[in-house]
Amino acid sequence: MSVKNFMNNKKGDSGIGTLIVFIAMVLVAAVAASVLINTSGFLQQKAATTGKESTEQVASGLQVMGVNGYQDGTNDANVSKMAIYVTPNAGSSAIDLTNSKLFVTYDGQTHVLAYDDVTDLTTGNSDIFDAINVGTPASEFHVAVLQDNDNSTGNGVINKGDIVAIVIETSDIFGNDGIPERKSVSGKVQPEFGAPGVFEFTTPATYTNKVLELQ
């Protein structure tokens, strides 16, 4: 073999080797790009899910619309029952009241009440305070449904547009036949997830009606 032929063969072998290395580099780059694209898509989906969950966590919660008290109309009668009207916050996810707690503070005592049962009053024909006459114990609250467009509250779940009253018997909780005049009461309805609905008021100087607007 002449020197010229040897050099030509050597150049040919080098060219094939370079081509193989180049193809290998292209394949590695393609695999790496595919991994990066898949990882990027996964991270994007995870970030979107996390962002949605965070938004729901921030937006979720309860709003207290008002508080009414009940006394039987006799002289020196105290507020023996109380109804706390609540609705989900705007943008809130569904709230499960069966896993919610009611905190009520009065006269240095804080009582924690759990869900008892639910009564449908959406027809508007019932006295809201009659809902408590189902034997609700002092450690539990009763839910009276006032507005429910999708029948979700039957299972104790409220969502957008629902309005319920959380009814308790203060005379059983605090004794002394309930809460007298000029007394401070505070509390919150704490859902399992989200912000609580907070209430705070002072009872009137005199009780002139059976149903009293407290907040």
Curated annotation (Swiss-Prot):
It comes from Methanococcus vannielii (strain ATCC 35089 / DSM 1224 / JCM 13029 / OCM 148 / SB). One of its GO terms (molecular function) is structural molecule activity. Flagellin is the subunit protein which polymerizes to form the filaments of archaeal flagella. GO terms for biological process: archaeal or bacterial-type flagellum-dependent cell motility. Pfam families: Arch_flagellin. GO terms for cellular component: archaeal-type flagellum. InterPro entries: Flagellin/pilin_N_arc, Flagellin_arc. This is Flagellin B1. Residues 1-12 form a propeptide. Keywords: Archaeal flagellum. The keyword Hydrolase does not apply. It is found in: Archaeal flagellum. Belongs to the archaeal flagellin family. It comes from the Archaea. The keyword Transmembrane does not apply. The lineage of its organism: Archaea, Methanobacteriati, Methanobacteriota, Methanomada group, Methanococci.
